[in-house]
């Protein structure tokens, strides 16, 4: 009887969770992001992650990555203006790109009176042996915001270096420099969750053996680990967070959002990428549902074992 009651309770709980999920806004929409964003109300998004075409002649099924540079910049200005309109006052807008082109976009953002923090995604696992010049090992990410943004630093802390761990608890004398006279002594403190996040994010790209089970047929797919970090840093813990993804592409941001249990709206002009993302989303849902059911079964078995031992 006790087992049956537990099963009934779980069924009710699953039904409530299903109804809650149906009320959530989780959509991947086929269409041009600029036109679709024009249909949305102001100040709706907590987080916006933009991974646009870099104008490097990649094939995304249209000509969006093959424009004259002035035309490309004007196009960027259009979708960025819409993103800023949709962003909440304390929200975060991330824009991926190569530094050489983001520098021009940064100037536009300055003219719009938008605050910007320049982040660097450093990947050290990609190499080009045939290259005859400096090899690229990073991309930049512009973190744009209107007012002081939500920032969950403790959720994205990083691993300490071995040297810092060994020095934990020791006293260090502040060195003389531009901002210090070197007269203050401090301790090497170690936080249980790791070091404070830095503006250089060291996460491998999906190249070689790294992320081979994650990769899909998309030239500029971002790793889930990176997408998750950006979302965790900016998600609103007090109420539902809405993520807007103007360029869905491979769908990595969408998958990360689903795993973080936040709402999302994504736009994608290429129907093949919409199908790809929906397929990844269904696979992710299946894995999570299967794991949840296994956890519930383990929980019931554990409770029954405790009850049995108590009766004895």
Residue ranges and their predicted role:
Residues 2-12, 16-267, 272-274:
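Core catalytic lobe of class I
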Residues 1-23, 281-312:
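Positively charged, low-complexity nucleic-acid-binding target-recognition regions
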Residues 277-278:
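Conserved SAM-binding loop
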